[in-house]
């Protein structure tokens, strides 16, 4: 369908019977309306032509050959005269044969039939709206019992037919013949309701706004009751509250989409265009047909049998009519979802029929295999590898992919900057990989996001936007924190890269799809960007340090004060491996690491700001060392306090490793960057 903004889109949902008929009906010049499929036949066995009013009828679905009717007459398509657009003899319209790919038909059902997706789906929409157990609704739909109509003012004779044997077993001998009498049809229409027709009546009587109001009142009452202390009662109350919320959401959705609840019960069954369920003739008189054709045949046969019984209702036993209604319901269920009744339906060769649900869903379904799995322009694909130096919103693109994706933009800028005179010369410069090409490419990429997608796209985080950067090699670099949203890992997974072209697409990518703006799970609200697997192992190795006991601190010489500047060029005097060095700042520690004087896990003492948490701590020192000048050192498990003779704290040193320092600096820079970004936005 095409919306008001002329965007092509596909929408799956409920439609009214009038809309189904409008999709299929065509009015012939003689006033006859065609579109209803009434016969289960396909092609005539002698002429190999489609049967009239059958599943491949040319009057309903259009001609097999463009501009040629069933009689063999031809006329150019698009004639202005309405009478000349149709064959006067066979009624086939002179149009292109491609109409058989989208022209639909319909089957007029002799009895209402529930849509199995809305009855047996999880959750069951019909059961939610009616606030009734699913098992009871299934028993009603499949004729296991009936219920009395509440609208009648006369005394009802029948309550639950399925309970006759238990409640009034003594009357069985007199009740059973009653269902075979000619007057039962009148009695049935007046007093009892059964099958999908009963469901349709109840859905039609619903007032969705009253449902929302009543459900809200009941939810508030349950909320006010609080917890009773009984675990079973509290659990039932929680389940009921969740059900009420779902019921209100469902009713609100029906109101917003202008959908009537009774449309979940079918009176007209749409018939797919014949080109979507073809019959193929092979050599040796072999015929290969779609399973959907066989399922449609079953529906039409059972529906015709039911219509015949209803016409002869005075002679047909009621049990036979109700049994035939159940068969029609089961045939439609098999057409829509073959496994809805437990075991899937099989043909004579013990082969499982593929229903409409089987054709649509799954990896080999119509959407994922035929529509979503196609190559598109301005896209590429490669294996992903970890990019630890990237920011969360960045991805690394190989040079080959980047120059292919942004080739037109590079050519435009080459011509605009007068580096070339025409497109052919610009392409040659790109082919020869001149330096100016890479400069322009980086400039173009700086302001243009790309989209990364990993199949299968099961939720919206399966495709996110990134700022591209050029990397060497032939793989796409990705920040490890965004892998959880894609459900990806670095064991050979492939990802596709797409280039948004229009300004609207680029704005949407920047405002809604950037990875640093999708930090929470849309389903449950938990953080989606959390370190996992190799990141946790790396952080553990970075911060574990050498587990030297406190004895190493007690008997370590603390004469190596930061007052004595460390001479990095002299490795003999100040830096012996049996001592834990002191540093006045983290920059000094990093400098020593770069000169390979210390390692990442080597314990060291780092001068720290006067922290009130450390000063006010009640921890007892392990040892106190006094010097001749009156100064002292209080040695604790993880820090050291230096004081003067006046008992004033002069400095504090913490015992740490370079790994801890690096990790702390990274977190500090990230927090500061976030604070600056937040201050800019506010």
UniProtKB/Swiss-Prot annotation:
Report any one BP term from Gene Ontology: DNA-templated transcription
The UniProt record lists the keyword Methyltransferase? no
UniProt-annotated location(s): Plastid, Chloroplast
Required cofactor(s): Mg(2+); Zn(2+)
This entry's comment on the bound cofactor is: Binds 1 Mg(2+) ion per subunit.
Q: Which SMART domains match?
A: RPOLA_N
UniProt keywords, alphabetically: Chloroplast, DNA-directed RNA polymerase, Magnesium, Metal-binding, Nucleotidyltransferase, Plastid, Transcription, Transferase, Zinc
Question: Cross-referenced SUPFAM superfamilies, in alphabetical order?
Answer: beta and beta-prime subunits of DNA dependent RNA-polymerase (SSF64484)
Q: Name one GO cellular component term.
A: mitochondrion
**Chloroplast found in the keyword field:** yes
Protein's name according to its UniProt entry: DNA-directed RNA polymerase subunit beta'
Organism, scientific name: Hordeum vulgare (Barley)
């Amino acid at each position: 369908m095409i919306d008001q903004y002329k965007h092509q889109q596909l929408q799956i949902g409920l439609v009214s019977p009038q809309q189904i008929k409008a999709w299929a009906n065509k009015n012939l010049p003689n006033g006859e309306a065609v579109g209803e499929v009434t016969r289960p036949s396909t092609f005539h066995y002698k002429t190999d032509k489609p049967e009239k009013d059958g599943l491949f009828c040319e009057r309903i679905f259009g001609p097999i050959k463009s501009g040629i009717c069933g009689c063999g007459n031809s006329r150019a398509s698009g004639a202005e005269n309405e009478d000349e657009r149709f064959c006067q003899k066979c009624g086939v319209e002179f149009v292109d044969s491609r109409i058989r790919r989208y022209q639909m038909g319909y089957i007029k059902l002799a009895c209402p039939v529930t849509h199995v997706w809305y009855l047996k789906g999880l959750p069951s929409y019909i059961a939610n709206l009616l606030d009734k157990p699913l098992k009871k609704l299934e028993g009603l739909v499949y004729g296991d019992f009936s219920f009395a109509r509440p609208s009648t003012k006369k005394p009802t004779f029948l309550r639950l037919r399925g309970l006759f044997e238990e409640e009034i077993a003594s009357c069985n001998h007199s009740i059973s013949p009653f269902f075979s009498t000619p007057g039962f049809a009148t009695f049935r229409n007046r007093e009892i309701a059964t099958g999908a027709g009963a469901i349709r009546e109840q859905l039609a009587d619903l007032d969705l706004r009253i449902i929302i109001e009543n459900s809200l009142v009941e939810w508030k009452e349950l909320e006010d009751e609080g917890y009773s202390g009984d675990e079973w009662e509290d659990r039932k109350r929680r389940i009921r509250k969740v059900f009420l919320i779902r019921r209100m959401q469902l009713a609100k959705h029906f109101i917003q989409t202008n959908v009537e609840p009774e449309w979940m019960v079918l009176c007209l069954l749409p018939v797919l265009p014949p080109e979507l369920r073809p019959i193929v003739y092979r050599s040796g008189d072999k015929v290969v047909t779609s399973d959907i054709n066989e399922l449609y045949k079953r529906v039409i046969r059972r529906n015709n049998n039911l219509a015949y019984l209803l016409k002869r209702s005075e002679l047909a036993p009621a049990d036979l009519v109700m049994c035939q209604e159940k068969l029609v319901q089961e045939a439609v269920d098999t057409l829509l979802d073959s496994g809805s009744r437990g075991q899937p339906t099989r043909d004579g060769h013990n082969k499982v029929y593929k229903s409409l649900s089987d054709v649509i869903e799954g990896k080999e379904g119509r959407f994922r295999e035929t529509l979503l799995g196609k190559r598109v322009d301005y896209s590429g694909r490669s294996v992903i590898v970890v990019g630890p130096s990237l920011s969360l919103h960045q991805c690394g693109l190989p040079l080959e992919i980047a120059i292919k994706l942004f080739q037109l933009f590079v050519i435009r800028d080459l011509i605009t900057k007068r580096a070339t005179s025409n497109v052919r010369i610009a392409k040659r410069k790109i082919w020869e990989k001149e330096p100016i090409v890479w400069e322009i490419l980086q400039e173009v990429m700086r302001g243009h996001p790309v989209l990364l997608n990993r199949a299968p796209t099961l939720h919206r985080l399966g495709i996110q936007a990134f700022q591209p950067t050029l990397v060497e090699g032939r793989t796409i670099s990705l920040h490890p924190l965004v892998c959880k949203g894609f459900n990806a890992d670095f064991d050979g997974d492939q990802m596709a890269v797409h280039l948004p072209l229009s300004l609207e697409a680029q704005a949407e990518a920047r405002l809604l799809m950037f990875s640093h703006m999708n930090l929470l799970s849309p389903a449950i609200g938990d953080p989606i960007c959390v370190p996992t697997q190799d990141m946790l192992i790396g952080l553990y190795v970075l911060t574990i340090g050498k587990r030297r006991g406190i004895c190493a601190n007690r008997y370590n010489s603390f004469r190596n004060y930061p007052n004595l500047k460390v001479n990095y060029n002299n490795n003999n005097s100040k830096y012996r491996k049996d001592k834990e060095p002191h540093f006045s700042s983290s920059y000094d520690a990093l400098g020593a690491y770069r000169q390979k004087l210390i390692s990442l896990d080597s314990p060291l003492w780092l001068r720290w700001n006067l922290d009130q948490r450390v000063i006010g701590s009640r921890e007892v020192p392990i040892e106190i060392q006094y010097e001749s000048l009156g100064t002292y050192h209080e040695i604790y498990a993880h820090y050291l306090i230096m004081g003067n003779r006046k008992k004033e704290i002069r400095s504090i040193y913490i015992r740490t490793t370079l790994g801890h320092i690096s990790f702390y600096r990274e977190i500090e820079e990230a927090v500061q960057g976030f604070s600056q970004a937040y201050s800019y936005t506010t």
